[in-house]
Amino acid sequence: MPKPEAGYRPPFNQTLVYGAQWRVFNAGTATLRMEQAGQESRIIGTADATGAVAVLYHVRDRFETFLNPTDFCSRNISKNAEEGYRKVDTTISFDYHRRKALLDQKNIKKKETKHTENDIPGCVTDIISAIYYVGSLPLQPGKTFSFPLNDGGKTVNVDIHVEAREQVKTPAGTYYAFRVQPEAPEGVLKNKGKLWVWYSDDAARIPVQMRGHMFWGTLTLTLQRIERK
């Protein structure tokens, strides 16, 4: 995996609060927070549908991941997903000694369990910590970075294209930001439409906006505020 930019300082103890927009609707809220946990870093994420969208499709997701803060190699990630009538708890542990990703999943509604093991290289990132990892890289328009990502199944190589530097206005402020597009030929990003993330062009490199063009419409997450504590 490409190394973080020299001098990068993780945005510890900052809760990033996002508002979600789908078509003309306020679709919900999401949060991201990174904090120190002993010798590791911990990232906590949430996503909740609200308003009319919640009536149409219930969403209440919770994520927690632990990683090595120097190289962003993921240690484990837990996901509690409530989406529609589906409720699934997932834990993925990365055993670098055995070079395996161990997935344990429990479908609460169906009372079914699943255990799988898949090969991994000497360092991988997960779907949540990858958001911060990309921000740690020396982003400049025209650059491309590649890294392995694992979400419990087969490890995939993700290509990150830095497309442009542009101004982004958010309720949290106006930022100059790098527009980044991730692509992968298979795995968790395949058939997900087109995705973009805008990272602030400053020392924090926080994701100030995220957008996905999917078959069911465009979903945009825009930074509303930063809670520092």
Report residues per predicted region.
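Acidic, serine/threonine-rich low-complexity disordered tracts
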Residues: M1-Y96, Y133-K229
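Hydrophobic, well-structured mid-protein blocks that either form specific transmembrane helices
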Residues: V88-V134
